[in-house]
Amino acid sequence: MDKLRIRTTPGSEVKETAPGSWLLSLPSGKAGAYRWAQLDDYIHLARSAFLWRPPLRMEISARVSSGHVPGTWGFGLWNDPFNVSAGIGGTGRRLPAFPNCAWFFYASPDNYLALGDTHPAQGFLAATFSSPLIPPVFLAAGVPFLPLLAVKPAARIIRRFLRLLVKESAAQLSVDVTQWHTYQLEWRAGEVRFLVDGAVQFLTPVSPLGRLGLVLWIDNQFAAFPPDGRARFGSLDSPEPVWLELSAISVHE
């Protein structure tokens, strides 16, 4: 794909090792310093101009350096919901939004990115989020309530409220991610199918709404909003360098 843009933190690297093949790598380092390497096709676009909508099929071949990477990694489609951008330096103008995504997603044990109390939230997952397309400017009304996330009883109430707005679906995948596999995602209105090496692993009616962008990344970040309401986030210690290798990336409508 010729529309992919590279984004990294200092010391991390995205390198094209052959035409259409990429190596995303992070150095070792201590907790408290964010390390991140990413390819995407949306950084320069407003959310309303993101490239992808159903029906489509995404296909990627991938392997990762370890089955226990500290942080997160993955690939798929999302609306970049948490990014704020004023359109400076070639980026698209963007405000926060509720999440819409369909992706293969790995989360180390410090993470808990599920609103449902029974959904899998760690390990290698096939996952979707589907949220109403509320104009982002209206979400600004919730900003004064963000400090309440530090108060467990209030955070639990907020979590239950978000569960009413944000639909989600996820399944744990039993895959040796250190070996090459072909990952496929088929997104239709009202259905998403996840396949590994041509075999269906997960089928869900929870389909994201709106236009989405392609993202492929690895980082040492953790974020958790578990059932106990103790919201937390940060960056993890990385004793060893880690990498994500990708090839044959394609998205077809």
Walk through the language-model features, giving the residues of each.
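Extracellular glycan-recognition surfaces and repeat-rich motifs
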Residues: 1-26
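Structural motif
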Residues: 21, 57, 191-193
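Secretory/extracellular carbohydrate-interaction modules
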Residues: 24-156
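Beta-strand-rich interaction surfaces with strong enrichment in secreted/lumenal proteins
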Residues: 43-50, 168-174, 203-204
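Ligand-recognition surfaces built from glycine- and aromatic
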Residues: 57, 67, 210-253
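Short, aromatic/His-centered strand-loop micro-motif at the edge of beta-sheets
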Residues: 122-134, 157-182
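Short tryptophan-centered beta-strand motifs in secreted/extracellular beta-sheet-rich domains
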Residues: 179-187, 192-194
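Short strand-turn-strand beta-turns centered on an Asx-Gly dipeptide
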Residues: 195-199
